[in-house]
Amino acid sequence: MKIKKSRIFAAQMQNNKIFSIGILTFVALIGSNNCTMAQETDVQKPRPTFGLEYTGEVQTDFKKLKSVNLLELGAQLPLTSKLSVELGSISVLTTDEDILTNCLQNFSSIDAPNIPFALTTAGLAWQINERHHLFAGIHRIDDNYFCSDMLGLFTHSSCGAFPTITANYDIAAYPVSALGIHYGYTKDAFSLETSLYNGVGYKDFSKRDNVFRICPESDGVFLMAQGEYDKNATRAYVGGSVLYSDLHATAQKQMRPVVWAYAEQDLTERFSVLAGYSHAFNNDITCHDFYLVCGRYAYKKAEFGVFSSYTRIDEKDEWATELTCNIQFNKIFSLQPALHFANTDGKNKCVGLVRLGVKI
């Protein structure tokens, strides 16, 4: 009986403490705009967020110049504390829609034809709980996959998505998107991503080239999944994809799988390395294998990187190497010069570029 009374008394004291703290916090908020209370209010009532990112490049093969300008807009509009609308778009302006060199892999990850406006994200995002999240709508695979810090340092297109996927299939990778569903799971050091998309990506709003188009019969379906392990100084990624399609009626409809794996290791506080491999099955495709190795060294506000890869596309071998340095001046501005070397079918090529980044 004494124990029960003492528990009741303790609970009353606890309630009195909570009540007193609540009164004091309320008075402090009214009198001095208490920051802690304001943060709690923000959590309870999420606010819309908007973003703008500009990436500009000047490219040269040391014979002529070319510029590419990419503008990305994004917005997240909360409906509830866990449900929100996500929107994103790109606009591309270039002085020359042709690639400077006829490399099998494009040396620039933002190179694209002129695009006045293309919708890249439009859908509902549901944060089910701290471990599970779901998105349904228009999206791109390179927004969720191949997004490691080291791959993000380089300007080469194969660091945005491996050519065993992008060189073989017209799936939803930059600059096109597709309707689909994406699910993510995270627990401790492990995370899992899986997606199901329309088998072909689009960027316009008219007739067949419609980003809202979903037609498994003619476009096929594209399934993708990746597991990630991130603990201490090691980050490992293993994934695979399957396209069920007839490749626009040019071949019999069948499963077309691709697998990949890559790992990052921090050797010191400043120096990291990465190695990866990807293989595409089936005989009626252009790219079967892709190998890559990278190194990164961080010093103050600068990151120095070297990237080298090998692939075989259309029965031609290509070795590609990039030397780059990304300087982050502040949270808004960055500058990144890069030098690309490629040996394609025995022919050597060299391209230089300077990339300016503005993020708000």
Residue ranges and their predicted role:
Residues E97-T121, R131-D219, G357:
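Surface-exposed coil loops of outer-membrane beta-barrel proteins
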Residues F50-V58, L87-S91, A136-R140, T194-N198, ...:
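Transmembrane beta-barrel strands of outer-membrane/channel proteins
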Residues D61-N69, T80-A122, I128:
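Surface-exposed loop and membrane-interface regions of Gram-negative outer-membrane beta-barrel proteins
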Residues S81-K82, L192-S195, E228-D314:
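Detector for outer-membrane/organellar transmembrane beta-barrel domains
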Residues T41-D61, V85-L87, T95, H156-S157, ...:
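Transmembrane beta-strand segments of Gram-negative outer membrane beta-barrel proteins
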Residues A75-L79, W126, I138, Y185-K187, ...:
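Residue-level signature of outer-membrane beta-barrel architecture
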Residues Q44-F50, S81-V85, E130-L134, L179, ...:
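Outer-envelope beta-barrel architecture signal
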Residues N348-I360:
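Outer-membrane beta-barrel "beta-signal"
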